[in-house]
Structure formats: structure tokens, C-alpha cells
Amino acid sequence: MTKPLELPVIIFISYLVLLAAGIQEGRYVKHEASYDQPISDKIINKIIETGDGDVFHCIDINLQPALSHPLLKGHIIQMEPTSYPSELKIKSSSDTIATEAHLPTIACPKGTIPLLQNSKADLKTQFSFDPIGNTHHRGGERAGCTTYDEIYGTQVAINVYEPKVRGQNDLSASWALMVNGPTGNYEGIGAGSIVWPNYHGDNFARFHIYWQVNTVNMPCFDHMCPGFVQVSKSVGIGGRIEPVSTYNGDQYEITVTISKDPKTGNWWLAYGRDKKPLGYWPPSIFTYMNEKASACFWGGQVHGPTVQLHLPELGSGHWAATGPGKAAYVRSIKVINKDSQYFIPGTHNTFSGSTRPFCYDAGDIRFNDDGARLLYGGPGNCTK
């Protein structure tokens, strides 16, 4: 089915804050107090540089940005999910032979997490767009599919490309987003691959996480503002995804899983086919996303202050009609119900579409036992 997409997303960059506090050993780590402080050499346990030049600071798990959130005072860090949704295996698609892409492994010591040193980004630059309906007049476009339901998580395999982005602070994303809330006041969480030149001074596909809460109306990425509690000591959020797909050539994908812990209520994020837990968004920071989502989007989005002057490529930079291996895809799409079970989105409440059909498109949704899938993309650089 197709209809205009109505998924809300508001994007702009915030600032980086950190806190200091105590730590205790065990599965849960309790944070007793918090106060904002600038990052300093004193809280860096180890510095690690990857082969492609990224620099990660290993900091104590209790000195991460999330715990400076005023609603997380006294928060006890949950080191792993209490349980996992059933039917986690993603099957191979008959018309897509894709290899799993990876993030660099960061060998931070036990009890620490890696934070990407982001000295090249202009963190003061901000941009946003209208979260409802057609968004081109506010600097955003999208193509993909959306389902509307009571949603407690999702799992998707995302085809990874490096689309050309012309504006330095514009971005092109391929990701999954979950939202809830009244019109004009949505909250959301998500993750996926983004090419964003101004983020780290390059045009690489990088793994980013996103969330927005209505109390501050301030969308955030990665660790730029408090909210996401990271537990992984080896996965660097914001790191480069490699390899990436080539048009009519080798195809690579990442698997993103977001699931609500049935006991703690935390929104857990896992990366890869082995579903490695990265961390979680505590429900206490949300008003509308504290219990469930009402809609979920999978596909591509472009945003930025100069998007309408120089529309970036989306996906592979080619139309969905070019077919598998040429257009980008999202596949094995599943959602999670209240009983922590996977199910395939319904044909009656799942729709594909584009906010700018002369620039980007989304193909028909295919439903099978593996989940839903579709192709999407476009060259951008159009005026209609």
C-alpha cells in the first residue's frame, strides 16, 4: 500500500555534557549523584585510535553523558536485558545476497565505554523541520514504509550505502524510527546508518542513534546530550560502518533491533545479527514513549539546512524501480508486541511512500514469512 508518510522526525544537534559519580561492581551499577562537567583528561581511562583515524575515549561507565539527565538521578544501570524477544533469527532473502557490515571493535577496559572524539563537528549548528506530512519546506524528505500499531520494538536489516551529501551539515540516513505522542509533540527513538559530513568531517556511513523527548523538544544523536545509557565496552556509537554496498555489486547490511524490556521497561538497542546489546533508553525520560510506540518507520531520510538547495542522494542514489542490488532496501522487517513476540507488520496498517516522489521513491511492500521488505532511494538534486 502507499500513502503519504506521516512519521515525525525533528533533527538538530545539541551539545555534549558529562557527569561524575560513583560506581559499584555487579550486574547493575548504581549512580548516586550527578553534576554537569566538561570532558577532561582526568576521566579518560584509555585512548584508542582505529585504523581509519577515529579516536575513542574510554571513560568510566558512570561518567557517561546519559547519567547527567535530571530524571536519571540515582539510576541503576542495567547491564543486560532481562530477556529477549522470541524468533530473533533473520533469514536470507532469495533475491538479496548480503554480507553483514561491521563497526570497529573498540577494546575499552571492563567498566568503561567508548566515546567518539568529535572535534570536527560544529555542535552549535542546529536545524529542524515540520514533523508532520510533507516536510520539504522545512528541510527534510523521506522514502520508505510506516506501520501504525501498538509497538514494543522492531528488528530490521538495513542495506548500507554511502550516498553523496552535498551540504556539509545535511545528512542522508537509512534507519528505523519508532514514535509516539500527539501531533506536533512526538517523541521517538531510532538507529541506523547516516552519512553526515559535518558530524566527523567525512562522508563515511556511520552508525548513529537518535531520540527525542517532548519535555525539552530537543532531538539528540549518540552521546551529544544525556538520555541513552550505553553498556557495551567494545562498540563505538558514531563509528564507521564497513564495508558498504556498491551499485550492482557486493551488498552489505546491518541489523538493528530495538526491544522493550518486559521487566524494567527500558528500550534496548542491539546491533548486528548476533544482537549485541549496546545500551538502552530508560522509560523515565519519556512522556509518550515510556510504554510503547504508535508508529514505526523504516527507510531513508534526508535533512539539513541546505537540503532543498542541494538534495542529497538517498539510499544507493538510485530509484527503487532499478531493482535489487541497485536500489537500497530494508528487509526482514518485524515488530514486537506487548508479549515480547515478533510479528510481521499487517497489510492493512503498513504503507510505503515518499514525501518528494519526483526526487525519491519507495517500492511496493512485500510480505513473507521473513518479514516485510521494500526498495527505496533516489538521486536527489531535483527541483520539483
Task: Show where each model-derived region lies.
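Exposed, interaction-prone regions of secreted/extracellular proteins
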Residues: 2-384
